[in-house]
Amino acid sequence: MARPYEGKLAIVTGASRGIGAAVARRLAAKGSNVLITFTSDSSRDLTRGLVEELSSKHGVHVQSVQTDLAKASTAAPIIVEAARTLFDSYSPPSGGKKFQVDILINNAGVSSNQFLNDPEKGAIDEAEFTRVYAINVLAPLLLTQAVAPHLPADRSGRIVNVSSVSASIGYLGQSVYAGSKGALEVMTRTWARELAERATVNSVNPGPAWGDMYAEAGPTFWRRNQPYVDAAPLMAYDGEEDVLRRAGGEADKFDRLVREQMGGRRPGFADEIAGTVDMLCTEESGWTTGSVVCANGGMRMSIA
């Protein structure tokens, strides 16, 4: 595989699993050194395994840092300092090369599904709003701000924010979550202007992705989602072998759920979404900024 990111340094937040891990794998495979961030103790072993995998398989420098993005004002400088430490490990200050972050992927996020005056969960309160916006909005803002002085000075930097199709659809019960992702897309356009001399800034808009978050949404949400996925051209599924290969050890479970509870319309896979993120990190994407690029099988197009 070509290594267009050789020698670059990337930060990927929320990269212990799912889309973040898939992005880290793609960047490392193409030569980038990677700092992976994670939050919970339960993700420590997964993250350690990913660091070892990427380092040994691709011969790049990979480290992780555990920090709570819900406390963004504390987390942002910790992440930048960890990135500096990683950079110094392969490019010591004595070498004369200035610390630089080439790629920032704001991927970490949390979900929220709660109606106004929800009959089961009660009314949305300030605590729920703060929980979601702290991680989905404030953390990307403060981390991008902290990284900005260390971006390249020649417009070769790349920032990609991971949003959600929820920001476009207006799902029932997603006032808080969809609002947070809409805010991230708006900030994308602002940063594209403010950081134009250093980096392109784009947002990737994924649809449903096979993994923990979509599984936890459950049958009620899947039924609510059905009209949207029915109209998405790439989500049609009928047991295709290439799709089942992507599901790996969960192929049987995937096949059963998609056929029986998702109306034969499949979610995407983390690696498919990571492919779009990767595309926006390339040199060839340098004329694209301030954009929301869909990685949702045509789902957003279906509601235009």
UniProtKB/Swiss-Prot annotation:
PROSITE patterns: ADH_SHORT. InterPro entries: NAD(P)-bd_dom_sf, Sc_DH/Rdtase_CS, SDR_fam. GO terms for biological process: fatty acid biosynthetic process; galactose metabolic process. It catalyses: D-sorbitol + NADP(+) = L-xylo-3-hexulose + NADPH + H(+). NADP(+) binds at residues 19, 68, 107, 177, 181, 209. Its EC number is 1.1.1.-. GO terms for molecular function: oxidoreductase activity, acting on the CH-OH group of donors, NAD or NADP as acceptor; quinone binding. Pathway: Carbohydrate degradation. The active site is at residues 163-164, 177, 181. Keywords: Carbohydrate metabolism, Galactose metabolism, NADP, Oxidoreductase. Disruption phenotype: Decreases growth on D-galactose and impairs growth on galactitol. It holds the Pfam family adh_short. L-xylulose reductase involved in the catabolism of D-galactose through an oxidoreductive pathway. Catalyzes the NADPH-dependent reduction of L-xylo-3-hexulose. Is also active with D-ribulose and L-xylulose, and to a lesser extent with D-xylulose, D-fructose and L- and D-sorbose. In the reverse reaction, shows activity with D-sorbitol and D-mannitol, low activity with xylitol, but no activity with galactitol, ribitol, and L- and D-arabitol. Belongs to the short-chain dehydrogenases/reductases (SDR) family. This is L-xylo-3-hexulose reductase. It comes from Hypocrea jecorina (strain QM6a) (Trichoderma reesei). The gene is lxr4.
